[in-house]
């Protein structure tokens, strides 16, 4: 590939990366604006003071994110696992106790 084309492709890739980062920054800023500090503090305190595990659930892309959150929590010492909502009623609900905290993730709100 000629050097000029390679340089042009690198510039295009760089611009694409910058646009992606800018988009992520805007999304995080919007998230920050929408947070209710009191509710967030209560939720974090509830999770921290729980004697059980953190159970994450979600369908589709929310489920993929939930799996990552559960894995990250578990790898940092917080007992956690993911329960797929479509399979929960087929035996997985039996793993959840009254002491556990369940976090349901949904983009649609359903």
Where are these regions (language model features)?
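An N-terminal, well-structured beta->alpha segment
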Residues: 2, 10-50
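Cationic, low-complexity basic patches in intrinsically disordered or flexible, solvent-exposed regions
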Residues: 7
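Glycine-rich phosphate-binding loops that contact phosphosugars or nucleotide phosphates
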Residues: 48, 52-110
């Amino acid at each position: 590939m000629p050097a000029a084309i390679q340089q042009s492709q690198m510039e295009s890739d760089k611009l694409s990366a910058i646009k992606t980062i800018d988009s992520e920054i805007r999304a995080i800023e919007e998230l920050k604006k929408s947070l209710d500090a009191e509710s967030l503090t209560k939720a974090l305190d509830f999770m921290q003071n729980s004697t059980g595990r953190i159970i994450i659930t979600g369908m589709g892309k929310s489920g993929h994110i939930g799996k990552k959150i559960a894995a990250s929590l578990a790898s940092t010492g917080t007992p956690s696992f993911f329960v797929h909502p479509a399979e929960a009623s087929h035996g997985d609900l039996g793993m959840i106790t009254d002491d556990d905290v369940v976090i349901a993730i949904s983009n649609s709100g359903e």
